[in-house]
């Protein structure tokens, strides 16, 4: 799939598809959420014994409320400790002892192994896929950051944006709903809801085939095609701008 030669968009969607497959495969097999693995990876590679909670929120693209919940779990299982500043009790810090750092290191090593084993089974040929937990963290934050960019600049969800990118890459800009579902790497209800939203906003046309009413066609007219191309070019430029690149670790 060419995505109309928008290389950064192609890379972005490849990464997101990889993350989707990874979560679907790994989530049932481990006793820790992916977010908790990522949080431990972040804390491990910071190599600091005390970190302000505000810095963690700033570096990671998760909602603050989500981070609070995951930190509670990690505190409960003695991976980290949470302390309040003696100067200002409103400021919270995450503290890590040497014993806890060793415990975290074991989990990060396990995460590295999980990623390598998944990559062997997945057999993706893309150069974008992460080789270890540190790269996984960076790519996860990269995709989350740009999902926010897309939502802010285009007022589209990531699924809606992906649908536009896929349809404009097809010959004659026509795709079967069945093929779109298989390509997009998102849940069926989520994809259909996004399609209906795009149709309602006038981005595309969704109709039954006149040759076979069991088939649903998704396509665009010339004006819709031009508008979608402009949006894709805008996002591709944002993705190519190094100033927008959100990496936790260089």
From Swiss-Prot:
Keyword Transcription regulation: yes
The UniProt record lists the keyword Disulfide bond: no
Protein name: HTH-type transcriptional regulator SarS
One annotated GO biological process: response to stress
One Pfam family hit: Staph_reg_Sar_Rot
Family: Belongs to the SarA family.
Subcellular location: Cytoplasm
Cellular component GO terms held in the UniProt record: cytoplasm
DNA-binding region(s), chain positions: 53-76, 177-200
InterPro entries linked: HTH_MarR-typ, MarR/SlyA-like, SarA/Rot_dom, Transc_reg_Sar_Rot_HTH, WH-like_DNA-bd_sf, WH_DNA-bd_sf
Taxonomic classification: Bacteria, Bacillati, Bacillota, Bacilli, Bacillales
Gene that specifies this protein: sarS
